[in-house]
Amino acid sequence: MRNRRFISFLLVMLLGGAACSRSAKTKKLDIVLVTKALDSEFWQRLKSGAEQAARQNPEVRLAVLAPEREINIDQQVAILEDQILKRVAALAVAPAGVAEIIPVLEKARAAGIPVLIVDTDIPWPHRAGFVGIDNRLGGRMAAEFIVRAIGGRGKVAVIRGVLGVATQEDRLAGFLDVIQKVPGIHFVGAQPANSERALGMTVMENLLTRHPDLRAVFATNDQMALGAMEAIAARNLTGKIVLVGFDAGREAVRAVLDGRMDAVVAQFPERIGERAIQEAIKAARGQPVEKFVDIGTGLVTRENAHEFLR
C-alpha cells in the first residue's frame, strides 16, 4: 500500500513537472513595435522586417501598432499607455514627437518595460538602444547631389515633414550643412508637408507659383517627393527642376528610373525593423543591447535604380 502511494506521488510530481515544463516552453515574449503610422511603403517595409525577426524567434509574439497618421501624436501616446498597462516584455518605438512621448516612455521605465527607440532618435537617456540611420548624413547626400546637378547655382527649396521630429530636423540640418557653403545657391526656405503626398503636391504648387525660377527641391520623404513630382509634371516642368526624395520606396525608385525624379536617398526599412526586434528581444531577456545601430544609407540615381528594384 505504502509503495502504491509512493508511486502515485511520483506520478503526480512527474506529470506536474511536465505540465510546468510545457507551460514554460509555451510562454510567449510579448514584443510591441509602435511606429508613427502604417500608411506608407516605408512603414510597411519596416513592419515586414520586424515580422521576419519575430518569425525567427518562435517564443516571440509581435504586435505592430500605429496611429492613423504621423501627426496623430496623441494616438501614439494612447497606444503606448495601453501596452504599458498590459505589461508587455519590451517596446520598440518610433516616436512621433519628443515632449509628448518622453513622459509615457518614463511610465514604461517605471513599469520595468525596456524601450528601444527606432528610426527617430530622441534625447531620452533611458532608452535601451537605438536602431536607425544617420539622417544628417542623408541630408548632406541629397544636397551634394543637387549642388552637382545644378552646377552650384540657383534657387533651392526643401519640402519637409512634421516640425520638431528628429529625423526631419536632422535631414534638413544636413542639407543646410552643404547648401549654405555654396555661394551661388539661394535657399528659399523649407516648407512643411507633414510627410503626406497630397500636402507635398500643394506645397510644391505654391513654391512654383512663388519661385518660377526654382532650380531644385529636396523632399525629406518619398511621399512628399511623389506629391512634388506630380505638381512639377502638371506644369510640364519634368526634367527642368531637380527633385530629390528620401526613403527609396519602389514607386520613388521607379520614378528615378524613368526620369520623373532625379535621385532619392535610400534607407533600408526592412533591415531597421528586423534589427529593432532583434535588439528588443535582447532587452526583454535582460541581455546587453547595442546603444546605437546605424543601418546605413545609399543614394539612388538613374544609373543604379534598377538595383533597388530587385
Q: PLM features: what roles do these ranges have?
A:
Residues 20-23:
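Bacterial signal peptide processing site
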Residues 32-53, 57, 62-77, 82, ...:
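Extracytoplasmic "Venus flytrap"
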Residues 42-56, 60, 138-142, 166-185, ...:
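Short, solvent-exposed amphipathic alpha-helices that sit
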Residues 56-69, 155-158, 179-197:
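Short beta-strand elements in bilobed, periplasmic/extracellular small-molecule ligand-binding domains
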Residues 76, 131-156, 199-201, 249-252, ...:
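Hydrophobic alpha-helical segments within soluble ligand-binding/sensing domains
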Residues 90-109, 175, 188-189, 193-254:
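Hydrophobic alpha-helical
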Residues 98-137, 145-148, 155, 247-262, ...:
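Flexible loop/hinge segments that line or gate small-molecule binding clefts
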Residues 159, 163, 167, 178-179, ...:
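Hinge/cleft segment of the Venus flytrap/periplasmic-binding protein
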